[in-house]
Amino acid sequence: LGGLHQSRNVTTVVTEVLVDADDASFQSPSKPIGGFMEEAEAREHEHADGWTVIEDSGRGWRRVVPSPRPREILEMEVIRQLVESGTVTIAAGGGGIPVVRDERNHYAGVEAVIDKDLAASLLARRLDADVFLISTAVPKVSLYYGTPEQQDLEEISVADARRYIAEGHFGRGSMLPKIEAMIEFVEATGREGVITDPAHLAAAAAGGAGTRIVA
């Protein structure tokens, strides 16, 4: 902002995100974290450290941890007030801090990683955002990514997105959670979402770049 001669306030909100203590992911870890490993190294961690490991999208082996779905953002009202005041607000970083609520209505942290895309989708819905943008490493969503048959997508419907998921086009540790986050936003609001890379964010916000996901 300084380089653009903008004088707007910027703040970061440490964000607690409520999850369900009975979420199935606590019994079936699914969120890839950390670097890629050879299978032998992954199996060693599995036996020695109790890790759950998977083969991830043909790129190698990774550890997976519980990733419960975000239900509510505890600091939502504060975030809303900051946004409405014109403050550039950074929230739900890394998916936020996962917490559960006990029978006494007290909150406690849990060992898990909330998917950052699903948390961002929840944040966008609670803020009643006009458009939901996700920045990633590629300018557009693709089918058959990384193959000679790669097909970049300009616009897809929610129905298209669900079909492509069923056909296995999107990797669990890469594009899949972004598409799922977009589906949630578009279905809940009727508005569009866009996925693109940082270089095309401004153009995407104006409708001129990226992959648009529509109802």
Place the predicted regions along the sequence by residue:
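C-terminal catalytic "cap/lid" subdomain
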Residues: 1-215
